[in-house]
Each structure stands twice: as C-alpha cells, then as structure tokens.
A protein has these predicted regions:
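Early extracytoplasmic/lumenal segment of secretory-pathway proteins
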Residues: 26-93
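A ligand-binding cleft/hinge motif common to bilobed small-molecule-binding domains
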Residues: 90-94, 219-242
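Extracytoplasmic ligand-binding site segments that recognize negatively charged/polar headgroups
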Residues: 36-43, 80-219
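Periplasmic-binding protein-like
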Residues: 130, 163-167, 195-201, 207-208, 239-263, 277-299
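C-terminal motif of bacterial Sec signal peptides marking the signal peptidase cleavage site
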Residues: 20-23
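A bilobed periplasmic-binding-protein/Venus flytrap-type ligand-binding module shared by bacterial periplasmic
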Residues: 135-140, 255-270, 286-289
Length: 333
C-alpha cells in the first residue's frame, strides 16, 4: 500500500512539474502600447494586433494627452511603454531623445508621407491629421431668425449670444488649434481681443473643458454653433443629425498625431514587428474607418459625408512647445 501511495505521489509531483514547466514556456511576451485615441479606435487596434500576434500579449492602453505626455516626460527611457500609437506631435517633439530615431527600421519610409507632416528628427511617424470645423445646427438658427455665419467676426455679433460653444485651449487640443490659427492670421494681441469678445457669446459657463464639449452642446440643443473637430461633426451627421460643416476664409485649423518607439526599445525584434504592422495595417485601417484626412502622399481614404477638399489653415508653430507654452500663458480663461 505504501509503495502504491509513493508511486501516486511521485506521478502527481511529476504532473505538477510538467504543468508548471508548460505554463512557464507558454508565458507570452508583453508589449505595451499607449495612445490618446478614442476608445473605439483603441478597440480596433487591439483586435487587429491580437489577431496578428497571438504569441504576444499586446496591451493598447488609453491615456489622456496631458497624462501620457507627462508620464513619458517624467519616466523617459525607463517607462513601461514600448510603443506610442498616437500622441500629439507637440509633445512627441518635446520628448527629444527619449524616443528613437526610426530610420532603417522595417516598414519605416518617411517618403510615403506628406512632407509637411514628417519631422526633421525622424523620431515619429504620422498617424492621423485631424481638422477643426464650424459645425452649425441651421434649423436652430432658422428657428431664432438668424443667418448661418460666414466668418469668425460673425460669431462675436450680439445676436449669436449664448449660441456658440468652443473648447478651452488650456485643456483641449481642439481649442488650441483654433487659438493658434487666429494668432497666426491676426497676431497675438488681436487674437486675444477676439476671444475676449467671443467669450461673451458662449453658451453655458463659457469655454468647455473638453474638446467634445461643443458637439455635445449641439446634440443637446444648448448651442447652435460649435467649434469642434471635423470627424465629430461627420459622425453626428452620419447618425442622423442635420448639421452643416463650415470652413471660414482662414481655413481649417488642424493637429497632427504620430507614432513612436521609446528609445532603446527599437532594437527589440518583437517590438519592431509590432511597430511595422502598426504602420502597414493598423494606421491605414484607422484612416479607412475613422480618420480619412490625408497623411500619405499617394493614398487617400473616404468616409460618407466627410469633406474631401479641406482647406487647411496656417498652423505655423503647431509642433513648437515654446510657442504653445507662451500662448497658453497669456490665455486667461
């Protein structure tokens, strides 16, 4: 009986050891990706990466722009992040050598992209360009006996009081691109005077803290005119809203977001493979589904009701952190 128990115990221990060994051998390599993208875009990227790389445990995690920028600036090359899928160029530029030079890596070809979107440092690759627009609920304006505005100066007329929504540049990249474009076209002093006048016509408690504030205000009928992102307005139109998309003479302000690898991790072959797939498949699919504005020289995408000829504005200084810090320092709201 003792012999039988001994044999059973030995077999049990052997099975446990084999199970433990198998578990260890099946442990997947973790690759961590951070992005400031909307949740549905992150979900799509996560699904594509999981299907392409079942041998890896790839985590695509959301962080707000400010949170991710601060995290990467504080942690530098020692961060847990391997790949940045999407972050505003201004903040990527500020990271300097904390992000890797990408020349020579698989599938990295800066000649594929519009030259104005390619950084001189070659440390990040364009992911999306997203423009701002004036979204108008014409029916609400008609109800109030008001015409559709045709220029920025119309927005500061007293008859539009309480009908306009714009994000605060201090807390929203959307608000900042409108602000910067106004500075570039009118000069800093005149631009600040303009936004002082516009503040008197804003709905609710003034400039919204979130970039999605204006489109939400339009949906709720709290505003008739929203300074928002083009894709936000198109999304609502495709869901049944009767909005008009306007671009004034100054053109559409815009921002560019890009992808990067943390410095020191660009030599890891697994990270190289994931980053290459991000460029060749995930980025184009994101354009096809959500953000069709052109980033490639010879490749375009279309989405129902999305403007195809967007007149882009003068966005000098958009990637310059010193310019942004200076302008936000004098912004009083």
């Amino acid at each position: 009986m003792k012999k039988i128990l001994s044999v059973l115990l030995a077999v049990s221990m052997l099975v446990s050891a084999l199970f433990l060994l198998a578990s260890c051998s099946e442990k997947k390599k973790v690759i961590t990706i951070y992005a400031t993208s909307e949740d549905f875009r992150i979900k799509n990227a996560q699904q594509m990466l999981n299907e392409k790389f079942p041998a890896y445990k790839i985590k695509v995690e959301y962080r707000s722009t400010g949170e991710l920028a601060a995290k990467l600036a504080n942690e530098g090359k020692k961060t847990d992040c391997d790949i940045v899928m999407e972050l505003e160029n201004t903040y990527l530029e500020k990271l300097g050598d904390s992000i890797a030079v990408l020349d020579g890596l698989p599938e990295v070809n800066f000649d594929n992209y519009l030259p104005e979107l390619v950084p001189a440092s070659h440390r990040y690759v364009p992911f999306i360009r997203t423009s701002g627009t004036i979204a108008v609920n014409k029916a609400l304006l008609t109800e109030k006996g008001l015409p559709v505005p045709t220029c920025y100066d119309d927005l500061i007329k007293p008859e539009y009081k309480g009908l306009i929504s714009m994000p605060n540049p201090k807390s929203s990249g959307t608000g900042y691109v409108f602000y910067l474009n106004m500075v570039n076209t009118r000069g800093e002093e005149k631009a600040l005077e303009y936004f002082d006048a516009l503040a008197k016509n804003l709905s609710g408690s003034g400039y919204t803290s979130s970039g999605s504030g204006p489109i939400k205000a339009l949906k709720l009928g709290e505003a008739a005119i929203g300074l928002c992102m083009t894709w936000q307005a198109v999304d609502e139109i495709n869901n049944g809203a009767s909005y008009e998309i306007l671009y004034f003479a100054e053109g559409a302000p815009y921002n560019t977001y890009s992808s990067a690898i943390i410095s020191g991790k660009e030599t890891d072959e697994d990270i190289q493979k994931v980053f290459a797939y991000l460029l060749t498949d995930v980025t184009p699919k994101d354009k096809e589904l959500y953000a069709p504005e052109q980033i490639y020289k010879d490749r375009t995408f279309t989405i129902k009701n999305f403007p195809t000829d967007i007149p882009y504005a003068d966005m000098r200084g958009n990637d310059d952190t010193a310019v942004k810090e200076k302008l936000l320092d004098v912004w009083k709201y």
